[in-house]
Amino acid sequence: MKKKIESYQGAAGGWGAVKSVANAVRKQMDIRQDVIAMFDMNKPEGFDCPGCAWPDPKHSASFDICENGAKAIAWEVTDKQVNASFFAQNTVQSLLTWGDHELEAAGRLTQPLKYDAVSDCYKPLSWQQAFDEIGARLQSYSDPNQVEFYTSGRTSNEAAFLYQLFAREYGSNNFPDCSNMCHEPTSVGLAASIGVGKGTVLLEDFEKCDLVICIGHNPGTNHPRMLTSLRALVKRGAKMIAINPLQERGLERFTAPQNPFEMLTNSETQLASAYYNVRIGGDMALLKGMMRLLIERDDAASAAGRPSLLDDEFIQTHTVGFDELRRDVLNSEWKDIERISGLSQTQIAELADAYAAAERTIICYGMGITQHEHGTQNVQQLVNLLLMKGNIGKPGAGICPLRGHSNVQGDRTVGITEKPSVEFLARLGERYGFTPPHVPGHAAIASMQAICTGQARALICMGGNFALAMPDREASAVPLTQLDLAVHVATKLNRSHLLTARHSYILPVLGRSEIDMQKSGAQAVTVEDSMSMIHASRGVLKPAGVMLKSECAVVAGIAQATLPQSVVAWEYLVEDYDRIRNDIEAVLPEFADYNQRIRHPGGFHLINAAAERRWMTPSGKANFITSKGLLEDPSSAFNSKLVMATVRSHDQYNTTIYGMDDRYRGVFGQRDVVFMSAKQAKICRVKNGERVNLIALTPDGKRSSRRMDRLKVVIYPMADRSLVTYFPESNHMLTLDNHDPLSGIPGYKSIPVELEPSN
């Protein structure tokens, strides 16, 4: 693997994407049998991409798949296996020395495993023995709240519903979830602002908008199929404006791999009409600057007798809180706005002009907005900006959070939440004849804190790589090994499985692409995308191993062993997933006619009240919510000279690392790098390719013991005073305390650091 830093000149997509897909297929898949499965991905009679949550178009191409979707499916259907012979040759201690890419690249897990401390190896056991032993451990705890039930966004609606049902019959609301680490500020912030913790737009709105503002996200890597929608809106004359600390190729220009003319002529579509490199942590200042200009110009228009710039009728009829927001915004000083955002008043005025001129605007955002200690307030400032011109609840306009995992939103909808509503618990209890717990449980941060303090005794993970994804893994690694029980439901080996508890189990499950055969026949599961579309997913491939079970079957097996007097007919439900969906419909009325509607091509849309201008808030209206000050992250209040954000590489999806390249950013064969601007490199007196150390700072500006040594400097077009490193390697640079008090999300995108040359 050749290591090099070399500027990538191509557009997003294009032949670079085709070559990358070919390499992934060649390395992982049986080309004769498995490649054909790609033609069934994102199709009504096929399976949903296990990657991002971007919705499927109504009229899709015959090959509706993106580069990273292809990597995800190649990773899943690999013919490599991690079985008993693998563990006979590799102790847990030796595997801990492997890289995270190497661990998952070893192949698919194909049989149930139990950790044996004497040999330091995982050893196979039968499914029933695994269920019985896990059930016995869970029965032994005096308090159900000593167990943490983690969920990954790859889990289907059906499995997630059974999982929360089991945990609540057991007696716990402890549901740490991957959404706690990515879009919890969306769920909390949007719910407070507009009454619904989800986005308000549909894919069709991109066909009607005048302007799309993309802020704090990177579609070329994280949701590449979005590029097709951005290309289409630009082609018809609408505008897209990008706001991001780094220049990301997927926001700049795109060659559509499915467009023969562009591929044969190496032509491309320019996406962003303007690109603003806001400083890391400067989004709130920028947004308040835009709102201040809009209000001042609206006042001037009113004084001159010209038409209002804002939607006064909408504000008067549908909102509360505008006067307080107005006072706050007008009191924001320009010198502070410019200093914190890194943008001039002139640049912010250009943005305000573009927004004012557009009749219908969509704002798309990702974790660059949410992963801050004031991430919830960031989201609410985006809503404030949209509300000022009535851009919620009309065609071609709205808020568009870009979720990560393909069903992270669906899991939450069907009950994976530590704070369930009274109504949900009442309907759940009525359906099954038991009283669910009403005391709020743990989200991700509280869950890990409970593990670190010894309050938690067991951790069950429905997918994911919990230990690696969380902050401060050095502090949490030892407490994880001191748990009494750890159960990992997984398709591939990862680092969390190697932090073994007193009793540790790995339970292998089917992938999204594989046939799920139950007593009534082959089953379909359902997922919810970022735009609240529910659709079916049916595996088409032969399972990687004969012992694999579905997630639903695994949950039912553990539940039956743990709760022998359960009021739930677990086996009956798993025999036919239509029965699970009937129960979901009974508990959640918005799923009316569930089984009928998922059999329609494309599925159905869950009604979004805010998109219809029905505000399910205590005030009965949409709320302008003021955030005091301009700082996204109080831990940077001492005016740190450098702020670091963690990001994915292009060969990565969440904690899964497909390869060591980051093509669009020009990094190949390595991940031990730090990105900075040429201006910042000059200030720090370092050059491209030199090695430096980063030291995390405490809230009072002092050097901590958390550090990253010998990172290679990559000079890159981006904002100054901003550094970027890769997730999850840099997660240890923040502590469990560095989180948003409103949503609990860790501040992965604003870590104050100090830089020094390496010896």
From Swiss-Prot:
One Gene Ontology cellular component term attached to this UniProt record is: membrane
Q: What keywords were assigned to this record? A: 4Fe-4S, Iron, Iron-sulfur, Metal-binding, Molybdenum, Oxidoreductase
Which cofactors are reported in the record for this sequence?
[4Fe-4S] cluster; Mo-bis(molybdopterin guanine dinucleotide)
Can you quote the record's cofactor note?
Binds 1 [4Fe-4S] cluster. Binds 1 molybdenum-bis(molybdopterin guanine dinucleotide) (Mo-bis-MGD) cofactor per subunit.
According to the lineage, what is the superkingdom? Answer: Bacteria
- Which SUPFAM superfamilies does UniProt cross-reference here? ADC-like (SSF50692), Formate dehydrogenase/DMSO reductase, domains 1-3 (SSF53706)
Family, according to the entry, reads as follows:
Belongs to the prokaryotic molybdopterin-containing oxidoreductase family.
In UniProt terms, what function does this protein have? Probably involved in acid resistance.
What NCBIfam families does the database record attribute to this sequence? Fdhalpha-like, PRK09939.1
* Name under which the protein is recorded: Protein YdeP
